């Protein structure tokens, strides 16, 4: 009986760890991600939206140029970008702008010196 209880507990933990991936979006949040925000803050503008449900069908409420606005969503691959512990001494150089610029399962991630394609972090 004890072994069955441990197996059941293990199965529940395994299934529970996958729930955020399936049910991780908030109500009203659209699939996809926000495009990168490289623009400097030029002036203070009020937010055009607070959440995705305030945007037309194919747009998401994203932070861009220092305020939230409805922008076309971009596809996002599974996994998260690894942390970068380095500091850049040269000007930033972007080798990608969005996940779809990268081959296979690689993600377009911020690095010390710009964005580049990297394998997702294991976690």
UniProtKB/Swiss-Prot annotation:
<dbReference type="Pfam" id="PF00095">
    <property type="entry name" value="WAP"/>
</dbReference>
<feature type="disulfide bond">
    <location>
        <begin position="34"/>
        <end position="62"/>
    </location>
</feature>
<keyword id="KW-0964">Secreted</keyword>
<keyword id="KW-0732">Signal</keyword>
<dbReference type="InterPro" id="IPR036645">
    <property type="entry name" value="Elafin-like_sf"/>
</dbReference>
<dbReference type="InterPro" id="IPR008197">
    <property type="entry name" value="WAP_dom"/>
</dbReference>
<comment type="function">
    <text>Putative acid-stable proteinase inhibitor.</text>
</comment>
<keyword id="KW-0722">Serine protease inhibitor</keyword>
<dbReference type="InterPro" id="IPR050514">
    <property type="entry name" value="WAP_four-disulfide_core"/>
</dbReference>
<keyword id="KW-0646">Protease inhibitor</keyword>
<protein>
    <recommendedName>
        <fullName>WAP four-disulfide core domain protein 5</fullName>
    </recommendedName>
</protein>
<feature type="disulfide bond">
    <location>
        <begin position="41"/>
        <end position="66"/>
    </location>
</feature>
<keyword id="KW-1015">Disulfide bond</keyword>
<feature type="disulfide bond">
    <location>
        <begin position="55"/>
        <end position="70"/>
    </location>
</feature>
<feature type="domain" description="WAP 2">
    <location>
        <begin position="74"/>
        <end position="121"/>
    </location>
</feature>
<dbReference type="GO" id="GO:0005615">
    <property type="term" value="C:extracellular space"/>
</dbReference>
<feature type="disulfide bond">
    <location>
        <begin position="102"/>
        <end position="117"/>
    </location>
</feature>
<feature type="signal peptide">
    <location>
        <begin position="1"/>
        <end position="24"/>
    </location>
</feature>
<dbReference type="GO" id="GO:0045087">
    <property type="term" value="P:innate immune response"/>
</dbReference>
<dbReference type="GO" id="GO:0019731">
    <property type="term" value="P:antibacterial humoral response"/>
</dbReference>
<dbReference type="GO" id="GO:0004867">
    <property type="term" value="F:serine-type endopeptidase inhibitor activity"/>
</dbReference>
<feature type="domain" description="WAP 1">
    <location>
        <begin position="27"/>
        <end position="73"/>
    </location>
</feature>
<feature type="disulfide bond">
    <location>
        <begin position="81"/>
        <end position="109"/>
    </location>
</feature>
<feature type="disulfide bond">
    <location>
        <begin position="96"/>
        <end position="108"/>
    </location>
</feature>
<keyword id="KW-0677">Repeat</keyword>
<feature type="disulfide bond">
    <location>
        <begin position="49"/>
        <end position="61"/>
    </location>
</feature>
<feature type="disulfide bond">
    <location>
        <begin position="88"/>
        <end position="113"/>
    </location>
</feature>
């Amino acid at each position: 009986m004890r072994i069955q209880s441990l197996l059941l507990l293990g199965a529940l933990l395994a299934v529970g760890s996958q729930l955020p991936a399936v049910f991780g979006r908030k109500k009203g949040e659209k699939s996809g991600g926000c495009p990168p925000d490289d623009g400097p803050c030029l002036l203070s503008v009020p937010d055009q939206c607070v959440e995705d449900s305030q945007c037309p069908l194919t747009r998401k409420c994203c932070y861009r140029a220092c305020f939230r606005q409805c922008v076309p969503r971009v596809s996002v691959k599974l996994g998260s970008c690894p942390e970068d512990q380095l500091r850049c001494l040269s000007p930033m150089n972007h080798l990608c702008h969005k996940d779809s610029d990268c081959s296979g399962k690689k993600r377009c991630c911020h690095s010390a010196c710009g964005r580049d394609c990297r394998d997702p972090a294991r976690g």
